Structure formats: structure tokens, C-alpha cells
């Protein structure tokens, strides 16, 4: 079946990511290799943070600094966005392009809300004198959490680009795997944040 062939809900494959074009399958493999590299990157950042988290240089500790209500709200937004992306892929596999776009749109809004809260959080810390150069702890914290934030921004841009570029095309075997891969990437970002929330924030609050 070619990407250009007219598809219907009856002929659209249940797992379009497995019925992609050869080019799409190669990109799918490349994505998993990319994700492996991303995992190594974040593992190294976590290791660095754990090694430096007590090096406050007389500045505030994690327990004194973190604003948990803001962090909790941001966490809920990001976790909910993971659920909405699941709904988007569900509708994609049922060949309902409009509902897929709707749920991806909600995912983008939730992700943007998460980023907004993270920027607010960083701004508050800076105003309290907790800057990147304040201590080794501060540098490790901003590097880890900021790197994740940049990945969230990239994921939002990726999903938005797919939504806009394919708004008039609808679903086919060429673009369906792209939406699927973008959703997988978004789940990866969410999983990384769960580790950040646990290791950085929760463990930081208990000392």
C-alpha cells in the first residue's frame, strides 16, 4: 500500500507505524538509536547532579529552595499531557484525523503550561539569588532541569510542526509513523521528568 493511496477507516492499518514506507521504517530505527543517546545524556546529568547536590557553597539547599506547589502543578500538567497524547494516537489508529489533531493540540497546551511554570520557577530562584554560578549544586540543577525543559520545547515544536504541515493532508502511511514517533518522544520526556521529580525534588526535600 502506497502512502498516496486513498485510505479509509476500514483500510487504515491498526498499527500504521509497522506498515510504514521503507524510508519511514529506517527513520523509526534511527529514532530508537537517537533515544538511546538521549538516555545516556540524561543518565550522565543525573549522575553529575547526585555528585554535586550537597555542594551548595553556603547557598540555599534543595529543601530551603524548592517551591513544591509550583513543581507539583507542573508535574500534573506534564503527566496529563502524556495521557492526552495516548488519546491522540488512539484516534490516529482509528483513522480519526480531527480528533487526533484535537488531542495533540491539548497535549501542546499542557506542555506549554508546564514550560511556563518551569520558567516561573527558575525566575523565582534567580530573584532569590540562586543563580547558575552560585554553587556546584545550582549549576548541576539548572543543567539537568534546563536540559529537560529544552527537550520539552523541542517536543512541542515537533508536534506543532507535524500538525500544521499535515492539517490539509490528513492521515496516510507516510505521516502516521511520524505522529507515532513524536508521541513516543513525548512519553520519553515524561518518564525523564518522573525521575527528575523523584530524584531532584522529592529526595531534595527529605535531605
Curated annotation (Swiss-Prot):
GO CC, alphabetical: plasma membrane
Record-level GO BP terms: aerobic electron transport chain
Descriptive protein name: Cytochrome c oxidase subunit 3
Enzyme class: translocase
Keyword annotations from UniProtKB, A to Z: Cell membrane, Membrane, Translocase, Transmembrane, Transmembrane helix
Reaction(s) the record says it catalyses: 4 Fe(II)-[cytochrome c] + O2 + 8 H(+)(in) = 4 Fe(III)-[cytochrome c] + 2 H2O + 4 H(+)(out)
Residue stretches spanning the membrane: 28-48, 70-90, 102-122, 144-164, 186-206
Enzyme Commission (EC) number: 7.1.1.9
Annotated localization: Cell membrane
InterPro entries the record matches: Cyt_c/ubiquinol_Oxase_su3 (IPR024791), Cyt_c_oxidase-like_su3 (IPR000298), Cyt_c_oxidase_su3-like_sf (IPR035973), Cyt_c_oxidase_su3_a-hlx (IPR013833), Ubiquinol_oxase_su3_dom (IPR033946)
Top-rank lineage group of the source organism: Bacteria
Molecular function per GO: cytochrome-c oxidase activity
Protein family: Belongs to the cytochrome c oxidase subunit 3 family.
Pfam families in UniProt: COX3
Gene from which this protein is expressed: ctaE
Membrane topology, from the record: Multi-pass membrane protein
The keyword Translocase belongs to this UniProt entry's keyword annotation: yes
